[in-house]
């Protein structure tokens, strides 16, 4: 408090704060933190929908900056090992490599790096967009864009320790969701049935030096081949700067979908601002998971299930999550590293063999995306 007060009275050119992510003092002119007296406002992970923000945790008497956003781990890239040519050697990477080799999986090392990296990029997009939607927040921090080599090593960057790209995302794609002006879209979920209607609430984050005098906002929806299924325009309007501004709402009926599909929702503001989001649409088989004389769907292995099997019939057993013994699965990659934050399950996503027949009606990439949320969470 004494140092902050001294700074304020001695130098009017700067703003002063007593700490980062620790105790707030009375003389603070801004506050960098994980939480305020109104609640936890830092954002470390995305959600399976985008219609949310952290405004209710804000609105205190000084500007608030969110501390250390995102920071989800990526599997080590063993190709970086030769780059450590000085007194610091990548012994930790060598330990991981030896462990993988001992378990007969060294040939999958690059796949593990790629799929975990793709998921971390996915998380950064959603985390940063949530930060931008939070209009009462004065900013956010990433610890860095590159990996942090201290504290046991935190491979959370989209750049490696040498500030080289990991090849996970291009600068142009990153700036679609992290730039002075960003198109944003609020919607309630990412997985739909074909008898539902998608509704998006468009916004624009504009902290550029200039107002947008005649902002022309367009939206369009494409399928996996890039074919445009529907498009439209929102009202042309004057958009201010230093804020988050509503653009309008649009809808799209999904009843034209007859087979499982991934669709991409696009939103542009003017000629230079563009962003996009994926959703997954499925036919609504209302008779699915219904017991018949030949097939029993059940959550418990009971006398009825045994009887079905004894009679040569089929049983589909789907135990409730709280009844299954084993490690709980999660969607998110581990935070920072398990040396500093040792909580279960310390996993880094999934390597999915997407070409297998079991995924014929479940559209997926090799890495996790938001259509997996419910499966892994429940």
State where each predicted segment sits:
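Substrate-binding/catalytic cleft of secreted carbohydrate-active enzymes
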Residues: 1-159
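Outer-membrane beta-barrel proteins
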Residues: 116, 188-190, 207, 240, ...
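Aromatic-rich peripheral "rim/lid" segments of glycoside hydrolase catalytic domains that contact
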Residues: 143-208
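Beta-strand-rich binding/interaction modules
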Residues: 196-236, 247-253, 260-270
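Short, exposed coil/turn segments at beta-strand boundaries within extracellular/luminal domains
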Residues: 270-276
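A glycine-rich, often tryptophan-bearing local segment used as a flexible ligand/cofactor-contacting loop or short
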Residues: 301-377
């Amino acid at each position: 408090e004494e140092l902050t007060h001294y700074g304020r009275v001695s130098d009017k050119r700067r703003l002063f704060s007593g700490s980062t992510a620790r105790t707030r003092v009375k003389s603070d002119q801004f506050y960098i933190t994980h939480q305020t007296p109104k609640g936890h406002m830092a954002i470390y992970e995305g959600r399976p929908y985008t219609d949310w923000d952290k405004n209710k945790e804000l609105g205190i008497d000084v500007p608030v900056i969110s501390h250390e956003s995102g920071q989800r781990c990526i599997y080590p890239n063993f190709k970086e090992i030769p780059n450590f040519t000085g007194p610091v050697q990548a012994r930790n990477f060598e330990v991981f490599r030896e462990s993988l080799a001992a378990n007969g999986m060294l040939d999958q090392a690059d796949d593990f790096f790629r799929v975990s990296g793709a998921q971390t990029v996915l998380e950064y997009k959603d985390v940063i967009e949530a930060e931008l939607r939070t209009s009462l927040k004065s900013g956010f921090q990433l610890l860095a864009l590159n990996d942090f080599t201290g504290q046991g090593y935190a491979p959370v960057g989209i750049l490696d320790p040498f500030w080289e790209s990991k090849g996970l995302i291009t600068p142009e794609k990153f700036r679609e969701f992290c730039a002075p002006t960003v198109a944003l879209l609020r919607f309630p979920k990412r997985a739909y049935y074909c008898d539902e209607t998608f509704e998006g609430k468009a916004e624009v984050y504009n902290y550029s030096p200039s107002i947008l005098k005649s902002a022309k906002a367009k939206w369009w929806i494409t399928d996996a081949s890039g074919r445009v299924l529907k498009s439209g325009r929102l009202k042309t309007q004057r958009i201010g700067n230093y804020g988050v501004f509503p653009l309008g709402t649009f809808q799209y009926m999904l009843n034209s979908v007859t087979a499982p599909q991934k669709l991409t929702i696009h939103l542009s503001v003017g000629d230079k601002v563009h962003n996009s989001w994926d959703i997954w649409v499925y036919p609504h088989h209302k008779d699915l998971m219904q017991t018949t004389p030949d097939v029993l769907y059940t959550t418990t292995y009971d006398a009825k299930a045994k009887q079905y099997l004894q009679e040569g019939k089929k049983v589909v057993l789907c135990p409730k999550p709280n009844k299954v013994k084993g490690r709980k699965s999660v969607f998110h990659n581990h935070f920072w590293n398990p040396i500093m934050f040792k909580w279960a399950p310390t996993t880094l996503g999934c390597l999915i063999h997407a070409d297998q027949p079991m995924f014929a009606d479940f559209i997926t990439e090799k890495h996790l995306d938001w259509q997996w949320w419910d499966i892994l969470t429940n």
